[in-house]
Each structure stands twice: as structure tokens, then as C-alpha cells.
Amino acid sequence: TLLASSAASDVYKRQLRSNDAYTPGGKAGFRPDRAVTVYSQILKRLYPHVPVVIGGIEASLRRLTHYDYWSDALKPSILAESGADLLIYGMGERVVQQVARAMRNGYNAKLLRKIRQVAFLSDESYVARLDPAATIRLRSYEECLTDKTAFGENFTVIETQSNLMEPTATLVEAVGDRCVVVTPANTTLTTEELDHSFDLPYERAPHPRYAGKGDIPAWEMIRHSVNIHRGCFGGCSFCTISAHQGKFINSRSERSILAEVEHVVKSPGFKGYLSDVGAPSANMYRMGGRDRELC
């Protein structure tokens, strides 16, 4: 998910958009609000015994208590409402492989809960067995509903942990009679790992099922662009890029970038120029702190 479903539908003062840049023909109304929750609930209803793993920006940014602008209310973790079994947060290439290996012989909660950068619901007895020195108990969802400072305290802890290069703390937040457990994030991918992800043979095109249904505006804007790094150290209060991708810059190699440029140049409809060579926000290619040990 590139954009949260509610944000794709919403404009100023909670009015519905008349168009949607992510659908063929730019037409609005083809995606439900809170799509991850809606689709997860459908899957669990149709296939109750099949584990559902959610990820992407909509799930990632709702892994704990969060403010929902559309309803003007605090919402619990998306795990509590969606019924999903596991949540992968942040950029998940490394994690999704670990999850796939752990589930090779079926759903194994014990193995999955040992993986970094995931979230899941548990009972209090599981939390009691966690190492107290490596566990941070957040204020509960119910406390956040009645006390604004509780929600603020939680955010401070979450933001502090997301700013660490190598976080070690497991976060726990009570929701009703259960707990949301968030394992610490992985370090950023190495350049080699990031290159491998970008070097996969992507089609760089909309799904064939959309053929003949009109141009997809968002696709037309980025079809001849190249992403050269991840992360943003800006930390702007209005933006969630650093919360999802992290504040440490993760750059591709020049070889990988140039290989993609050659592929784009040879693609159908190329107009003779690259529309953008950049990253999520600004060009921070290979930027970083002088003393990484302090991070």
C-alpha cells in the first residue's frame, strides 16, 4: 500500500474525493476505507483456519493505538479490529522471507513470535514470560482513551525506539484482555540486500486486468522515475515516511541504479527523460551521521 485507503478517499474537512489517482481512469470509490481491515475480515470469514499476515503502510502505521482523522477518535491496533494473525511493519523484504520460512510447515506461533519487526496479539501470560529488561510496557489503549497524556507518552516511546539504529526493546500495549506485542525492528538492509530487492524482474506496469480501463494517474507520474534510496532523516511532524522507512538512509549501489535506468530507457512509451531520480522525500543519497556509533 502506497497510501492509506482513507487518505486516498479523503480531502479537506473529511469530504470524499471526486477522483482517485490510484485507480484506472482516476475514478473514485473503488477501494473501501480501512482496506486492510475490510479485506482481512473477509479472508478470515471465508478461510478462518488460514493465517493472515498483513503489512504495508496502512498496517504498519496502525500497529498500536493511533488517531484516526476520519472518525476523529483513537483506534486500537489494527490487529484487534482486522483479525489478522501477524503484522509486518516497516520495509519488510527481510522479514517476509523469515515469515515464509517459519510457515513452511504450517502456522507456528512460537517461531513467528521470535522474528524481529513483527507485531501480534497475545495473552498476559505470554507477556509475563518476556525479559523485563528488554520489554517496555506502554499505556493501554483504554488509558489512552481517557488520558491524552497517556497517548502522548506512548508516542514518545515509539518515536524514540524508531530513531535507534539497532533497537532492542519489545513494546507491549494492552488492548482489552489481550496485549499487542511489537518486536524490535531490524537494522536497515545492506546495500547488497537493497540492490537484490530492486534488481528483481519487475514488470514496471499496472496489472493486466486494468487494461483498457483508462490511465492510472499515479502510475503515469512515476512510470519513468527511479528510486535511489530509502529513509528520510527529516522527521517532519506531518509526514510518516520516517516512521515507516526509518530515519537512516539506505542507498542502492550505482550499478543497480544505472541498470534500472537502462531498463527504463528501453521501456515502451519512454519520452526521452527520467521524471525523477530520487527517494521518498528529498535526495539524501548516501547521507548519514559522521559517527555511526552514536546512533
Locate each region found by the language model.
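Two-component system phosphotransfer/interaction surface
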Residues: 91-105, 191-198, 262
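Surface-exposed amphipathic alpha-helices with a cationic face
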Residues: 39-47, 265
